[in-house]
Amino acid sequence: MAHGAEMHMGKWPAPEVESAGYHEQAQLMQQAGVDAIFVEMVWEWSSHGKLAVAAAASAGIPVAVCLAVFDKETCQQECPCLSDGTFVEEVARELASGGRFQNVEAIMIHHTKLPLTHACLRAIRRGGWTGPLGCYPDHGTFVMPCWVYDELQGEHFVGEVSQWVEESNCTLVGGCCGIGPETIKGLSCWCCKHNGKSVQ
């Protein structure tokens, strides 16, 4: 259930229409027997992201909320914000409070540049979220009409992941756009060793 990134600069429907659309999609997925709903690309919270997450949570199945953070300055200041100015810590606090978000089982940071991830994960924990925490960043830059990637050393990525785990008890890790199979292979080996399993 992707949350309208393509509508970033366009016109949004009336809130009740937008909410009804999210609820309809959530119910259709629930009726189809999905095990969980991942609400991705939540780069805005106050007007739209909150509606999408509440609708997903109303379906009565586990929900993962996947926040995308682009603001380098606020991350460097240890107070990361979404694009609407909402602090990541505030979002975590609201999700941790239960209520209409009681079926939210995990919060993730995704589609976010690697150097920004640590501040975001720490902010989620500061917000009082004690449940599962995940991170799957992207890598590269979109230059019309396609993505451009520079090399990402697998060892560097694994080093970042180990810090997520140690500092923030991050238990769900992976990669988004631009994190290729070789990097994921190295991550898989690290995860097996970390979890005490033999590497195949």
Sequence positions of predicted segments:
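Domain-level signal for soluble alpha/beta catalytic cores
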Residues: M1-Q200
